[in-house]
């Protein structure tokens, strides 16, 4: 009887089970926020060691197009120079030397050099700065010191002490950085504990010279101060009619990057306090209180956007000593910093700190850091970064032969992938009435590139997953291609006969590739903006365009026709 009842119950519910099994959940794609504007793509193959032992590096490009790097090493402030864009460097020269200081009571201490800095003035002179740091308390004052060179670093003036803090570590002065105003006034910004000898507080101070640093105002101005806290590590730039100073601010929890600002005309008449609207958290997405992000550095690029580097424990351990360099991109007003990248791949038990940024040319920046990521010692390492922006496609018909001739493609290949390893690709886009053309120059550099993939969102749909109307073209290094169309979050191979590709091989497994894609295949009628992503695949890793993901088309780069 029981068996019969169970059979009857099963037969009654069977239609409902069958119905449920046959019904599929409807696929719902979501809109994705578009990622527009500039990005920084770090070039792993450009990485080099500038000093096997050293720290706190700063690179400056001079008016003669040479480069100078200053850094701290073995208690000295050191300088090296490059005349070939950073490929080779001169022998190191000590601009500031470690020395012994003896006070009036006959007590002596070693004074180390720290926080080396450099600026080239509007008149061509070089001015270097550093922080005098005595190794013993109560003997010598901490100090901000400069030297001048009128012959591009061949000879240097005597040391000039601009400011002296207390003779102890808790009342010191630190981290000088320069700014020259449009009217020629030269400023030195620094972190200053000396006014707060009965507390652990610290402010940002500034000194000004009206004659290119020969004579300095006696009055020191307070730039910013948060009562009960420690504003530190100032770096100043000009943006429009404003002075922007990046600082580290420990308002709550760990240090975070902030921007304090003043108009050039106001020029710090009133200090920026903790509740001033002229003090702003720099990052678009705030970090958790327990994440450290200190030692910020600013760089304005030719298109007006402002880059900021800092050292952070984000997605690492809580030990700030093992933080790594990160670079974010702000808008032209120095706000909303986002699109973070990490120039160096630093293991969790290593560090990349006390970093800075420099502009090498209109399309290239340099990041330098003190790191032991690649050796057992902390040294000075540099890497170059390509400034990528929304792609302006070049209108030109291409003869498909795999040869990326200047007549057809020009000199500009605005897309770059190559941050993870020595292999990299550069790419450009052309078009005519009927076709879109994509060029790729592949540089395996020892890591064979097995496949290149081109991702296209022809209608700029900006969705979170691939679906109908989203395409992926896979290209082998022999020119064989397959075409895939998005399908409910995945990919489905479709006919690729109308797409053609030509490969031209070179030495050491390098090759160039041209692809012709009819607009009709992409069902693209107009020439409104679209989006593109690239991916290279080696036997060890895959890598796509910086700040992009293969699935999310809004993260791909915009192409304008």
Each model region followed by its residue ranges:
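Solvent-exposed strand-to-loop "edge" motifs in beta-rich extracellular domains
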Residues: 72, 441-445, 518-520
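Surface-exposed, glycine/proline- and aromatic-rich loop segments on solvent-exposed faces
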Residues: 414-484, 539-540
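Asp-box/BNR beta-propeller blade signature and adjacent active/binding-site loops
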Residues: 27-389
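Short, well-ordered beta-strand segments enriched in hydrophobic/aromatic residues
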Residues: 402, 435-442, 511-517
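Sec-dependent signal peptide recognition
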Residues: 4-11
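Glycine-aromatic-enriched beta-strand/loop faces of beta-sandwich-type recognition domains
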Residues: 467-510
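C-terminal motif of bacterial Sec signal peptides marking the signal peptidase cleavage site
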Residues: 17-18
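Acidic/polar low-complexity flexible segments
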Residues: 390-403, 455-484, 519-561
